[in-house]
Amino acid sequence: MTRVVPQSGSANLVRNKAIGPRGSDPLSRLLAHLIVRGGRTTEIERATSRPWASALFEGRRHIVRLRLHGPNAAERAAAYHEGIESAEFALPGHFVADIQVDASGQDQYGPWVEISALTIADW
């Protein structure tokens, strides 16, 4: 879907500024869903979000590294691999177009999981 914002003007295109209203970053809602999926003792070690766009869509690319703690942390970390691609995430104004576990492992601090996701603005 294409939007026209008459107030933007052509100078705006040259300066490469955002055109029209922008939605909020859905990263915080996505993190909340990932923590629920991992359990109460899930810790966010790192989370980044950057703009993403194609010819037809705009959204954000997210990379999240989670650390799981507790007696069954290894089992919960392994559970991230099962069904995350088909999981439903309620993100107002956005939807998860792609999500996957990129890497996982265990070190002296316990198991960790690195996840990448692409969220698209739902116009």
Positions of predicted regions on the chain:
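Long, contiguous binding/interaction regions
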Residues: 1-123
